[in-house]
From Swiss-Prot:
Subunit note: Dimer of alpha and beta chains. A typical microtubule is a hollow water-filled tube with an outer diameter of 25 nm and an inner diameter of 15 nM. Alpha-beta heterodimers associate head-to-tail to form protofilaments running lengthwise along the microtubule wall with the beta-tubulin subunit facing the microtubule plus end conferring a structural polarity. Microtubules usually have 13 protofilaments but different protofilament numbers can be found in some organisms and specialized cells.
SUPFAM superfamilies: Tubulin C-terminal domain-like (SSF55307), Tubulin nucleotide-binding domain-like (SSF52490)
Enzyme kind, highest EC tier: hydrolase
Active site: E254
Record-given protein name: Tubulin alpha chain
Function as written in the Swiss-Prot or TrEMBL entry: Tubulin is the major constituent of microtubules, a cylinder consisting of laterally associated linear protofilaments composed of alpha- and beta-tubulin heterodimers. Microtubules grow by the addition of GTP-tubulin dimers to the microtubule end, where a stabilizing cap forms. Below the cap, tubulin dimers are in GDP-bound state, owing to GTPase activity of alpha-tubulin.
Length: 450
């Protein structure tokens, strides 16, 4: 089996996790108490969904997941929520004291007390797997727990499970909407370790997803539940090929191979189509070509950056539902002829496609319409650098005055770590610049940079 373990860290990670597991359960027909009436092989079996769920002797399906937070309120919602019977109580780990939006607390003082417990739980899950494929890590980098404890866990996972791939779904601070003053610090410090310790990171941004909800779903005031349900569709599409049998299956390690040209350039944009409300879907027939085009629209990107300002290095298109390879090839051929969608000149093919025959499932009472086919795109584009330069600029403004730095130093960090992380990100921006440059020009001035 090719199992995946999901690790949900901090409030954002846990709430996205709730939406994902709710959706997985609906997709597989697993009830909130873990029973699965449709499963013929009780107590084991090699069904495709066993990559995400382990099965007890009594036929109960338990998610291969760990939820961690440094304070109890968010995890208590899981403990008392609809799906409380789904999880083993040991999978829900909460501390007593918050990271207080402080990377250093999450990474050093408070985080290090809980990290060994988390690793024990993860080890138990890993021992339960026959062929662990990798980890899916969900967190946000603006707060304290997601950034600090998230980085710490990733560093420790690299030590304990060196070769296993780690896929991150990371919520980055938005350009306008901010939830905390020290977001830029936490993000820069956290990205520093994401660079080292994740193999692929999919960037999400609340503002971009708000706009999609407002524009495409006509929700005037989107809540986090609306956002998370949209994000969970993306994550479900990515993992569908692990959980169902399809025509063109895509493995987690395959994402890595196809999307990451250089180890540091592994930050991806994601988009999903069709995002459409039930009232509209009734009147529209969405062909493969249409949903493919709409996945490439700058407004469908789930992070605030404009792919028209950069070049694509690689794209992964995951279709699900009533889709045949012939239509996909035609749609991709059309995309390649478009002038607005530019690829770097050293990567002529640039597309990886996956097809899964399981049509997209929607949460009853949710916002998305039930459709016959959908596509999720994960793309590696040089325009992602916009996200980093935005955060770096805000970081510089604050750090020039050393504002708020004493909170971090007081928790055992050194100022050197700030400048080290900032330099690493400056190098990352430069890497993106060089990757997007025309390769013919690049040959004369190679010598100066190194």
């Amino acid at each position: 089996m090719r199992e995946c373990i999901s690790i949900h860290i901090g409030q954002a990670g846990i709430q996205v996790g709730n939406a994902c597991w709710e959706l997985y359960c609906l997709e597989h027909g697993i009830q909130p108490d873990g029973q699965m009436p449709g499963d013929k092989t009780v107590g084991g079996g090699d069904d495709a969904f066993n990559t995400f769920f382990s099965e007890t002797g009594a036929g109960k399906h338990v998610p291969r997941a760990v939820f961690v937070d440094l304070e109890p309120t968010v995890i208590d919602e899981v403990r008392t929520g609809t799906y409380r019977q789904l999880f083993h109580p040991e999978q829900l780990i909460s501390g007593k004291e918050d990271a207080a939006n402080n990377f250093a607390r999450g990474h050093y003082t408070i985080g290090k007390e809980i990290v060994d417990l988390c690793l024990d739980r993860i080890r138990k899950l890993a021992d339960n797997c026959t062929g662990l494929q990798g980890f899916l890590v969900f967190n946000a980098v603006g707060g304290g727990t997601g950034s600090g404890l998230g980085s710490l866990l990733l560093e420790r996972l690299s030590v304990d499970y060196g070769k296993k791939s780690k896929l991150g779904f990371t919520v980055y601070p938005s350009p306008q909407v901010s939830t905390s003053v020290v977001e830029p610090y936490n993000s820069v410090l956290s990205t520093h370790s994401l660079l080292e310790h994740t193999d692929v990171a999919v960037l999400l941004d609340n503002e971009a997803i708000y706009d999609i909800c407002r524009r495409s779903l006509d929700i005037e005031r989107p809540t986090y539940t609306n956002l998370n349900r949209l994000v969970s569709q993306v994550i479900s599409s990515l993992t569908a090929s692990l959980r169902f049998d399809g025509a063109l299956n895509v493995d987690v390690t395959e994402f890595q191979t196809n999307l990451v040209p250089y180890p540091r350039i592994h930050f991806m944009l994601s988009s999903y189509a069709p995002v459409i409300s039930a009232e509209k879907a009734y009147h529209e027939q969405l062909s493969v070509a249409e949903i493919t085009n709409s996945a490439f629209e700058p407004s469908s990107m789930m992070a605030k950056c404009d792919p028209r300002h950069g070049k694509y290095m690689a794209c992964c298109l995951m279709y699900r539902g009533d889709v045949v390879p012939k239509d996909v090839n035609a749609a991709v051929a059309t995309i390649k002829t478009k002038r607005t969608i530019q690829f770097v000149d050293w990567c002529p093919t640039g597309f990886k496609c996956g097809i899964n025959y399981q049509p997209p499932t929607v949460v009853p009472g949710g916002d998305l319409a039930k459709v016959q086919r959908a596509v999720c795109m994960i793309s590696n584009s040089t325009s992602v650098a916009e996200v980093f330069s935005r955060i770096d600029h805000k970081f510089d403004l604050m750090y020039a005055k050393r504002a708020f730095v004493h909170w971090y130093v007081g928790e055992g960090m050194e100022e050197g770590e700030f400048s080290e992380a900032r330099e690493d990100l400056a190098a990352l921006e430069k890497d993106y610049e060089e990757v997007g440059a025309e390769s013919a020009e690049g040959e004369d001035d190679e010598g100066d940079d190194y």
